């Protein structure tokens, strides 16, 4: 879809909120951090940005 997802691994605490809220399963927890594994599926809805308590996700 043309959206770029960046997770600041220094800020990410691995809470999984982005994993739970994403409607197209862009994220996966790996080694205790959120990783965008299906970035090409991103709809740009920004739900992940809104729920991240650490502001670790940038679109």
Curated annotation (Swiss-Prot):
Q: Name one GO cellular component term.
A: periplasmic space
What PROSITE patterns is this protein classified in? Answer: 4FE4S_FER_1, 4FE4S_FER_2
**Domain 4Fe-4S ferredoxin-type as annotated: residue spans:** 3-32, 33-59
So where does [4Fe-4S] cluster 1 get bound? 12, 15, 18, 52
Keyword list (alphabetical) reads: 4Fe-4S, Electron transport, Iron, Iron-sulfur, Metal-binding, Periplasm, Repeat, Transport
The record ties this protein, via Pfam families, to:
Fer4_10
What are the recorded GO MF terms, alphabetically? 4 iron, 4 sulfur cluster binding; electron transfer activity; iron ion binding
Q: Tell me its cofactors.
A: [4Fe-4S] cluster
Record: residues binding [4Fe-4S] cluster 2: 22, 42, 45, 48
Q: Cellular location of this protein?
A: Periplasm
Primary localization class, coarse: periplasm
Q: How does it assemble?
A: Homodimer.
List, alphabetically, the PANTHER family matched: ADENYLYLSULFATE REDUCTASE, BETA SUBUNIT (PTHR43687), L-ASPARTATE SEMIALDEHYDE SULFURTRANSFERASE IRON-SULFUR SUBUNIT (PTHR43687:SF6)
Its function, per the record, reads: Ferredoxins are iron-sulfur proteins that transfer electrons in a wide variety of metabolic reactions.
Please identify the protein, giving its name as recorded: Ferredoxin-2
């Amino acid at each position: 879809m043309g959206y770029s997802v960046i997770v600041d691994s220094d800020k990410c605490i691995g809470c999984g909120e982005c994993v739970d809220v994403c409607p197209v399963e862009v994220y996966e927890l790996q080694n205790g951090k959120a990783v965008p594994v299906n970035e090409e599926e991103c709809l740009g809805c920004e739900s992940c940005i809104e729920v991240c308590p650490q502001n670790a996700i940038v679109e």
